[in-house]
């Protein structure tokens, strides 16, 4: 969600920070948007994790504009990248954000949805990831919080596993030191 709650921000930060403690460093992929996306990217950089920002514009246009300095920092950081499926001069149109989500879902072995409204872009990304036979996790939230309704629905529909602790996520991904025998899939980009 672009309108991340304090609960969502706390769990996004905890989750990405915990991933940084793993022996095998995962790649954090998100869309450079307000809220959860930028929280994940910033926490990844602060924690020494590689991160990729998938753009819904041409490569020279950072949207939202206020993330331009951060995008430049990300781009200059070894192991990090900005990628776009669009040619230079492409404006930030609504349809482009939906198409960007298919790239995010395709790059990632696992999708973690921190918060989403029922019709949020994260819902589309999560459903695409599920349709690609990827693992999907969603942070359960209060039933009366619009920002948690999407996550709660994905859990109810069994599209996503509930993210109930960072330790469980690390175990599930085979990144926890307590897990000794688990194949970890990685992608080279």
Residue locations for each model-derived region?
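Glycine-biased, small-residue-rich flexible motifs in mid-sequence functional cores and linkers
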Residues: 1-189
């Amino acid at each position: 969600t672009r309108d991340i709650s304090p609960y969502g921000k706390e769990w996004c930060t905890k989750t990405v920070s915990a991933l940084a403690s793993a022996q095998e460093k995962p790649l954090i992929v998100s869309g450079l948007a307000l809220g959860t996306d930028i929280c994940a990217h910033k926490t990844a950089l602060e924690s020494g994790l590689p991160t990729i920002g998938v753009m819904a514009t041409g490569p020279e246009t950072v949207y939202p504009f206020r993330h331009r300095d951060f995008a430049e920092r990300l781009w200059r950081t070894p192991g990090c990248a900005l990628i776009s499926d669009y040619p230079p001069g492409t404006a930030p149109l609504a349809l482009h954000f939906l198409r960007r989500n298919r790239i995010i879902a395709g790059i990632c072995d696992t999708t973690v949805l921190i918060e989403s409204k029922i019709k949020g872009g994260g819902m589309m990304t999560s459903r695409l990831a599920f349709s690609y036979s990827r693992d999907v996790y969603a942070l359960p939230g209060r039933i009366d919080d619009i920002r948690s309704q999407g996550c709660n629905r994905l859990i109810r529909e069994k599209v996503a596993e509930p993210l109930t602790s960072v330790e469980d996520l690390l175990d599930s991904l085979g990144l926890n030191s307590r897990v000794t025998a688990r194949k970890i899939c990685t992608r080279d980009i």
